[in-house]
Every structure is written in C-alpha cells, then in structure tokens.
Amino acid sequence: VHWSAEEKQLITGLWGKVNVAECGAEALARLLIVYPWTQRFFASFGNLSSPTAIIGNPMVRAHGKKVLTSFGEAVKNLDNIKNTFAQLSELHCEKLHVDPENFRLLGDILIIVLAAHFAKDFTPDCQAAWQKLVRAVAHALARKYH
C-alpha cells in the first residue's frame, strides 16, 4: 500500500485523538450487535444476550481495547502492515477459524465509530484515508487464508 504524506497525516492526526479503550469497546460491541453471527467467536465472554448486555460486558470492553490497540500498530507501521499482522493473521486463521469477511465488517464499523466521535475532523479526505487503512488491515489479517 502506498500512502501519500497527506493520508499519513490524516490517519496519524486523528489517531492521536482516539480513546482506544472507549472506541475499541464501542466498535466491538457494535460488531456483535449489528452482525450477531460474530458472537459465536466470543462464546467465552458470557452474557451477549442483548445490546445492553453486550455494551456492558467487561470482556467485550477489554477485547475491544485489545483489538484497537493492535490496530494502532498499523498506524505506527503504515509501510509494513502485512508483517505487522502476520502473527495475528495466523492465529485468526489457523486457531480461531474466523471468517476473514469479519475483518472487513469490523473495519467498516470502526469508520462509523470514528465518524461519530470526530465528526468535525472526519472529513471526506480523512474518511478516504481511514477506509484505505481499514482495508489494508483487513487484507493483512486475511493473508494466511490465501
């Protein structure tokens, strides 16, 4: 993936404002609520019976933070996203058997969360840069599936 200087600035500038715990928890909760079939990967998380239960579930919040923290590694390593996610790709493919389409869904949800939290800063140019980033991350995570 080639990044222009402007794209890098838009991504890193917004990332500096992101509350990883809050946005990560919200993104994962939204994934589990909007796409309920993804809940099967989180059976060990306990009560996922309703949107309220999911939003209030401490394991969802903790894993959401973990997911977005690892996403931050992509922001730090824009020029080496494939290698940054090589181990996570292997884990999700070979051990967890996660459908790689779910990575794309989570990326789309992250875009929605960022737009909701940073409406003024989330310009069309910023959205385009972030859309490119979430696609690159989803592709890197799906790499071991090919």
From Swiss-Prot:
Tissue occurrence: Red blood cells.
InterPro entries to which the protein is assigned, alphabetical = Globin, Globin-like_sf, Globin/Proto, Hemoglobin_b, Hemoglobin_oxygen_transport
Q: Does the keyword Heme apply?
A: yes
The Globin domain, residue ranges: 2-146
Output the superkingdom of the source species.
Eukaryota
What family is this protein classified in? Answer: Belongs to the globin family.
Indicate what this protein is called per its UniProt record: Hemoglobin subunit beta
Supply the source organism for this entry: Vultur gryphus
| Source organism phylogeny | Eukaryota, Metazoa, Chordata, Craniata, Vertebrata
